[in-house]
Amino acid sequence: MKNFDSLYHELAERAEKRPEGSGTVAALNSSLHTLGKKVIEEAGEVWLAAEYQSDAELAEEISQLMYWAQVIMIKRGLTPEDIYKYL
């Protein structure tokens, strides 16, 4: 099972190795503006799932929000440690 750190390391490895056909690589090649819009979209889906959907659907939406937040972290050069100091 993945956690925040293991997901980050998986995504960072993809960013470094740039495997062909990777959705993460495609996302990293897009602008921060585009990635920011994706985070906003996913945050809205988390809210809607919290209001109207099952716990499983909510968990899935939260996982997608975490993914996109980490893509932005990697694009900007942040690590989990940079985030943890604010938790």
UniProtKB/Swiss-Prot annotation:
Q: Which Gene3D superfamilies match?
A: MazG-like
Query: What's this protein's name?
Result: Phosphoribosyl-ATP pyrophosphatase
Reactions this protein catalyses:
1-(5-phospho-beta-D-ribosyl)-ATP + H2O = 1-(5-phospho-beta-D-ribosyl)-5'-AMP + diphosphate + H(+)
Q: Which NCBIfam families match?
A: histidine_hisI (TIGR03188), PRK00400.1-1 (NF001610)
User: Of which family is this protein a member?
Assistant: Belongs to the PRA-PH family.
Which pathway is this protein engaged in? Amino-acid biosynthesis; L-histidine biosynthesis; L-histidine from 5-phospho-alpha-D-ribose 1-diphosphate: step 2/9
User: Which top class of enzyme applies to this chain?
Assistant: hydrolase
**Keyword hit for Hydrolase:** yes
Compartment(s) of residence: Cytoplasm
**Example of a GO MF term:** phosphoribosyl-ATP diphosphatase activity
Q: Name one GO cellular component term.
A: cytoplasm
Query: Which keywords has UniProt assigned to this entry?
Result: Amino-acid biosynthesis, ATP-binding, Cytoplasm, Histidine biosynthesis, Hydrolase, Nucleotide-binding
What is the originating organism of this protein? Corynebacterium diphtheriae (strain ATCC 700971 / NCTC 13129 / Biotype gravis)
Q: A Pfam family in this protein?
A: PRA-PH
Q: State any GO BP term from the record.
A: L-histidine biosynthetic process
EC assignment: 3.6.1.31
